[in-house]
Amino acid sequence: MTTFRIEGGIWMALGSIMWKRAIVLVVLILPALCCAQDAKLIEGAKKEGQVVYYTTMTLDQSKHTTDQFEKKYPFLKVTLFRTGGGPLLNKILTEARGGRFDWDVVVGRGEMVIPLIDRKLLASYRSPESKMIDAQLVDDEGYWTAYYVNSYVLGWNTKLVKREDVPKTYDALLNPRWKGGQISLDTEAYGMVEGLKRAWGREKAIAYFKRLAALDPVLKRGNTERVQLLVAGEYPLIIAYNQTIQRMTSRGAPVDWLALEPAVTQVNPVMIAAKAPHPNAARLFYDYLLSKEGQEQLRGYQRIPVRKDVEPDPPRLFRGFKYTIENPECRDYL
């Protein structure tokens, strides 16, 4: 018995030593492998010399981001093209039909994902930065990762509506009090429709939007101009991106917002072209957008970053409320 215990102790000790050595090897070898991979990527990018970036993010913000990237990697030049979501998707598809594959990286709206996947226009790439991003915001097959998100919330003009009178739930928003041009809705808020279908089921979501439409809301495309009209008092309520409303609130405008739960959070994915002319530079830029540095730039723009170690400004933009993620790979937005 004594001998067995001693031998057992020896094996336990040996096992402990081997385990510790394994940990040491992992700690030493993995960073070395990552550095080697980074060095290979950078070397390849140097030979390519440029990256072509298509985006729907505003031109001033996109230009600032690409300028900072070029400072970090002075051997690369970024060619930037910016337009809206629909026109950008049309541009990519039209170019592909004509045999042109000019772009490397694209940031756009979630509804771009399926058309690009179906036409085999996206490359699969899992960025090492994705480990700092919620799994819901990273595609399992590597075709996209959320770059930033937008949450649809209810905003109001504080001069026209008292806080205690603001609807706090989706059902409260259906009160006949808000009938007749009292609510502003985006004509292209497909992500919100899809998100509530995901949360509630198709039948309940469609029934809800029919009841909302019966209130005769003010219909207009986009967010920025609609929020400006809210500030001007054109209507008392709006469903819009919280970041757009928050920018005006931070400037002292008479507007505020709250989340109707679950708030639908729309993904703005970053993707790499399957036939990227500069594949190494594309991956380097992709990693940069998702890095802590790249995500902190988004915070500076008052957009909503997706990294766990980068808080939005203010944090309430993506903290303190329940949300449901829009599925960029949804095939049925209606």
What residues fall within each predicted segment?
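An extracytoplasmic/periplasmic, membrane-proximal ligand-sensing/linker region
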Residues: E203-A205, V306-L334
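Extracytoplasmic ligand-binding site segments that recognize negatively charged/polar headgroups
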Residues: V52-D67, V78-A96, R100-E234
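A ligand-binding cleft/hinge motif common to bilobed small-molecule-binding domains
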Residues: G110-P115, P236-D256
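Short amphipathic alpha-helical coupling segments at ligand-binding clamshell hinges
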Residues: T65, K204, Y208-R211, P277-L289, ...
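Immediate post-signal peptide segment of exported/extracytoplasmic ligand-binding proteins
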Residues: A36-V52, E70-K71, N175-G180
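Periplasmic-binding protein-like
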Residues: A135, N150, W178-E188, F209-A213, V218-K220, L289-V310, ...
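A bilobed periplasmic-binding-protein/Venus flytrap-type ligand-binding module shared by bacterial periplasmic
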Residues: V153-L160, K197-A199, V267-H278, Q297
